[in-house]
């Protein structure tokens, strides 16, 4: 069984209670399912849960090269030279990130994004833009670290896809879950 959750900002990826954050238990009332990978507390979007340990490892382990798709709201203006850094191996200190596939998102696409609670801090004098980033690794805070290395602080990060599973195709509202009809 696969469960797809649209994880809100501020939710920790564990079922046990946490003193500072809501947990998965507040959203998914199904016993014996566990997250297949993690999503940082300050990130939002698609989280897959399963009761199958082998499938859980296949989704979470970078050696299986399952593509994860993120939409990142970045501070600054798009610059071809800086964005090209994301499409090459990028030394992040403790590891070298493999090249990402990227594309700028248009207003039609970003109109599908829900309001965040709490909202991000917007500075009128500093522009921002949305970028789709696809990676196959998923190391700790990798997308945020990659965009920062390219000179773009990440204001908001939403995972919209894992393999063939897409959050928008499933039509899951923020904080809601449903059984996933497609394997990643």
What would you call each of these model-derived segments?
Residues 1-184:
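RNA pseudouridine synthases
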